[in-house]
Amino acid sequence: MKRDLLSGGEFKRILLVEDDAELAAMLKEFLEAYCYRVSTVANGVDALKAVMERAYELIICDVMMPKMAGDAFYYAVQRVKPELCERFIVITAHGDTQRMQEFFGHVSGMVLMKPFHLEDLLQTILLLFRELEDSRRRLTLPDEASAVLPFPTVTGIPPGLQT
């Protein structure tokens, strides 16, 4: 029931980038209960390797991490797999700095401030997937489009083409 209701009947693959091992384990367990497949890494360097090796439907990324911070990781992903940037949820407790405010202005996905309730994370994920699906639908014409935008009917041969 949870699977059909919350993940659209699919197992979506999520990359969770979080250096706090306890928080990462808790988030992984929570998301897997809703039928998401979650891979975890503790820093941006390992996250970039993971992105290059496997396809993910979503990235959830902390900002303050060792080796490569979340903002540097986001910009690296933007260079190598830009389509992933709209499927990014940035999580942070440090959103009040000038640097972070500038970074948030560049994020194509969403930002979630720590501390947050697990349900808020789930709702953010669902909202992001819903917005992506809506934008995909807008890019394709529905079957009814031919009724709304009919092609002209040719009823005769134009004079210049008559033999």
Regions found by a protein language model. Give the residues of each.
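Non-catalytic signal-transmission and effector/linker regions of two-component phosphorelay proteins
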Residues: 1-13, 119-163
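Receiver (REC) domain active-site loop signature in two-component systems and cognate sites
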Residues: 65
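Two-component/phosphorelay signaling modules centered on CheY-like receiver
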Residues: 21-39
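Conserved acidic carboxylate
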Residues: 18
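Acidic, metal-coordinating helix/loop segments flanking the phosphotransfer/catalytic sites
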Residues: 40-58
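Active-site T/S-Asp motif of two-component receiver
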Residues: 61-62
